[in-house]
């Protein structure tokens, strides 16, 4: 009898648990430098491989999706529906984040912490919306690739995909080339993803060994508040919208989306999760051409998890400063956070940049970010998981909307 192979999601979860245990052991024996010298390098190799494959995956999957649609009108239709879905859910995420943050704060559960001496946030990393709008149009295609500027990569994919469709029969060779290259990239990505248990184990062991149990400490309540927001948003917005618009039960939705959710949680990379997210979306009934377009786009612009995080963090940091925010200021947070999610889309460290924008809008010292900066990876695991869950839900909903539109047109 052939022994059944352990599934990748199970391997990743076991690697996560084992990494925490090993990390705690090295922390308590006072040898965290062992994980820094001998564990972290392997985790870094895994992260480098993820970064290496992100650009070709996004570029080729989007071009392939556009070509598969066969009509630029459908591309436009799918595009605006996708962006609208993400804007609505991002606004909802902000409201959920604020509700839970205020509940926790009014209950006196948020600790009042002080900024450590010498801790300074580099404001130079902030960017405004208009700067980003100009920057999404590339002046040098190769620089966009080498800098991994994902918004520029998406624009390049839209232009080449549209150009191939417009070329008609003359573009057949280009279509075949894209399909072939995408098939190869999928195989390479599968190989890299297969290494994820090693990457997860080594990185978690290093983080826990160097930070210790106090990586949570007094910030555990803030972390718990954010994760409660993540869970409620996933259930209320994503699973319910999948049920209402695509006829998928919440249980089925989470069951079939779980492989991508687990991988995103441990890798903290939406872009690296694209192949798994697409596979999960297709299994839930999304059309392949729609998911090929929606998933890469969502991996770049869907930042619902980040929106919840920054609302919780803003209320918490305001409390640390002794400030009490008014209802009007909270409405400003919702608007600022929603617009910031567009303005910083595809920017490395976007979560922190968005938070800096919101804090500046609230006149809260931006340097206060440094209070929670140390455990940002723990916040990031949850928000990345939530973001890709939204991508999958969106692909299913847009597929259903396009199907209904096609049915009405056919009448």
What annotation goes with each model-predicted range?
Residues 45, 63, 82-87, 159, ...:
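Transmembrane helix-bundle signature of multi-pass membrane transporters/permeases
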Residues 311-411:
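Transmembrane alpha-helical segments and their short flanking loops
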Residues 259-341, 395, 405-411:
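Helix-loop-helix junctions within the multi-pass membrane cores of secondary transporters/permeases
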Residues 7, 46, 75, 145, ...:
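Residue-level signature of catalytic and energy-coupling elements of molecular machines
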């Amino acid at each position: 009898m052939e022994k059944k192979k352990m599934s990748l999601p199970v391997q990743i979860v076991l690697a996560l648990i084992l990494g925490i245990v090993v990390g705690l052991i090295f922390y308590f024996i006072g040898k965290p430098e062992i994980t820094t010298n001998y564990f972290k390098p392997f985790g870094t190799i895994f992260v480098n491989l993820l970064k290496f494959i992100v650009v070709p995956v996004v570029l080729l999957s989007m071009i392939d999706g556009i070509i598969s649609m066969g009509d630029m009108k459908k591309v436009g239709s799918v595009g605006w529906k996708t962006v609208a879905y993400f804007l609505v859910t991002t606004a909802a995420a902000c409201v959920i984040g604020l509700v839970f943050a205020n509940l926790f704060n009014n209950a006196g559960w948020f600790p009042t912490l002080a900024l450590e001496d010498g801790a300074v946030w580099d404001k130079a990393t902030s960017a405004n919306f208009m700067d980003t709008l100009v920057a999404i149009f590339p002046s040098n295609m190769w620089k966009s690739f080498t800098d991994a500027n994902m918004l520029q990569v998406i624009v390049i994919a839209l232009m080449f995909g549209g150009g191939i469709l417009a070329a008609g029969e003359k573009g057949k060779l280009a279509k075949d080339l894209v399909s072939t290259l995408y098939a190869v990239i999928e195989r390479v990505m599968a190989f890299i993803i297969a290494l994820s248990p090693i990457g997860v184990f080594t990185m978690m062991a290093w983080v826990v060994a160097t930070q210790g149990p106090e990586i949570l400490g007094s910030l555990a309540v803030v972390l718990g508040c954010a994760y409660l927001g993540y869970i409620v948003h996933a259930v209320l917005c994503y699973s319910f919208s999948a049920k209402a618009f695509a006829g998928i039960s919440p249980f089925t939705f989470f069951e079939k989306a779980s492989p991508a959710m687990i991988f995103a949680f441990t890798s903290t990379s939406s872009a690296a999760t694209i192949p798994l997210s697409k596979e999960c979306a297709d299994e839930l009934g999304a059309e392949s051409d729609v998911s090929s377009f929606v998933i890469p786009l969502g991996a770049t612009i869907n930042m619902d998890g980040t929106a919840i995080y920054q609302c919780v963090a803003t209320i918490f940091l305001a409390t640390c400063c002794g400030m009490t925010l008014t209802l009007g200021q909270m409405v400003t947070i919702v608007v600022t956070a929603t617009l910031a999610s567009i303005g910083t889309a595809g920017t490395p460290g976007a979560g922190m940049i968005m938070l800096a924008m919101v804090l500046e809008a609230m006149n809260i010292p931006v340097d206060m970010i440094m209070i929670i900066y140390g455990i940002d990876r723990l916040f990031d695991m949850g928000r990345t998981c939530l973001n890709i869950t939204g991508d999958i839900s969106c692909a299913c909903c847009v597929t259903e909307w396009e199907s209904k539109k096609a049915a009405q047109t056919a009448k």
